[in-house]
Curated annotation (Swiss-Prot):
GO terms for molecular function: mRNA (nucleoside-2'-O-)-methyltransferase activity. It catalyses: a 5'-end (N(7)-methyl 5'-triphosphoguanosine)-ribonucleoside in mRNA + S-adenosyl-L-methionine = a 5'-end (N(7)-methyl 5'-triphosphoguanosine)-(2'-O-methyl-ribonucleoside) in mRNA + S-adenosyl-L-homocysteine + H(+). Residues 169-249 are annotated as: Binding to NPH-I. Residues 323-333 have a biased composition (Basic residues). SUPFAM superfamilies: S-adenosyl-L-methionine-dependent methyltransferases. It holds the Pfam family PARP_regulatory. The keyword Protein biosynthesis applies. It is found in: Virion. Displays methyltransferase, positive regulation of the poly(A) polymerase and transcription elongation activities. Involved in the modification of both mRNA ends and in intermediate and late gene positive transcription elongation. At the mRNAs 5' end, methylates the ribose 2' OH group of the first transcribed nucleotide, thereby producing a 2'-O-methylpurine cap. At the 3' end, functions as a processivity factor which stimulates the activity of the viral poly(A) polymerase OPG063 that creates mRNA's poly(A) tail. InterPro entries: mRNA_MeTrfase-like, Pox/kineto_cap_MeTfrase, Poxvir_cap_MeTfrase, SAM-dependent_MTases_sf. This is Cap-specific mRNA (nucleoside-2'-O-)-methyltransferase. One of its GO terms (cellular component) is virion component.
Amino acid sequence: MDVVSLDKPFMYFEEIDNELDYEPESANEVAKKLPYQGQLKLLLGELFFLSKLQRHGILDGATVVYIGSAPGTHIRYLRDHFYNLGMIIKWMLIDGRHHDPILNGLRDVTLVTRFVDEEYLRSIKKQLHPSKIILISDVRSKRGGNEPSTADLLSNYALQNVMISILNPVASSLKWRCPFPDQWIKDFYIPHGNKMLQPFAPSYSAEMRLLSIYTGENMRLTRVTKSDVVNYEKKMYYLNKIVRNKVVVNFDYPNQEYDYFHMYFMLRTVYCNKTFPTTKAKVLFLQQSIFRFLNIPTTSTEKVSHEPIQRKISSKNSMSKNRNSKRSVRGNK
């Protein structure tokens, strides 16, 4: 891994200041993966999102409706964390698949084994009235093959729009991965929100979380066009290929790899029910508790490549401009 000096990670898609055309040989790279990496990715993003709502006074007294929640192992950590902080939260976890038994027997957690449609969403809204709802969606349908097609994605995003329209949540975190240019079908709409990037996503994943806080007005929609799709692909490939493969040398932490740097900036915003001498001590405590919960071993920084000059990532693309390829990034998860 090469080294770099950075002040902060890219937290949101709009902050990515460079792009790179996809290189087909990337598909042959052996991906480095942690145990339970998918649960770790979800846990960090949702802990960051819910802590933000806590900071704004939105979380306490809410019902979290999580659609597409199974297996949901990580949700037990979230539930326990906010319960120990004295937050009064109810959880409704809905999925056609079964949940991890670790979620059984909790009075504040309702498990529903079914898929949602418009009629069921209306029944949820009626059942929970007048509670304020926080919506988390991780819906993912695949009608064939190993990865969702563009038709699958458009169906999922239409369903997420219906969720917002019917449930009228105070805030939402939605699954968002732009279709690939060579699989384009038509323009479509998604809710307006901040496109949060995810540490520990698969190596070439183009998935983000779409975070929104609603202030009473009607849901604002953003149109996604084919030119947007090309922009998404190039920026996410730059992030995954260049940025996420760096070691941040000015980051004083046991593991200086970029994803840990990204995680640090997420966890520093999280409230704890104990005091720490430094922000680093708090983040280490949180990381260790999360990794212990998910049975993820602690790792040190991967061996870095020799680089005589440590420099910040340039805002200008230093790669060749003649690397166009018709092949798309295939990190769907």
